[in-house]
């Protein structure tokens, strides 16, 4: 699922059954048209609890993070105005000292020197990778197999072949061939 943690103008939700999808779709259970999701705007105090769709998205993300071996943070600055969201993520990830094998991957345009301090509540010692763009990230270098390759490199000492990764000059057709072949 794609989870829209701050709502989405293209998403709809069935309050009765907890189902969601595009706003033009119908609930697969009751067949009624989805209601539009609410949006959370960039304000100091966001309410992640009162709207059922947003609350359920955050619960799903928390569970996924809790069970994850690796997290990729893509262009998220964790602003002080989003303290509630950062706290929810920290709670889900837990103590980084108990995540001794897990890896954090950050894709951002900020300087690499800022990463360890900015994400200190998630990074165990040096267990992170920094990329300025998607193509040099684990996701871009090892599509469909990023966690598997990170585990092989760091836990099994197997050198990874990143020649099958995505490149900036690839067309949609190239991407499709790369993924499915």
Feature roles, as predicted:
Residues 1-53:
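Extended, H/D-rich, highly charged conserved domains that either
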Residues 57-181:
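SIR2/sirtuin-family catalytic core signature
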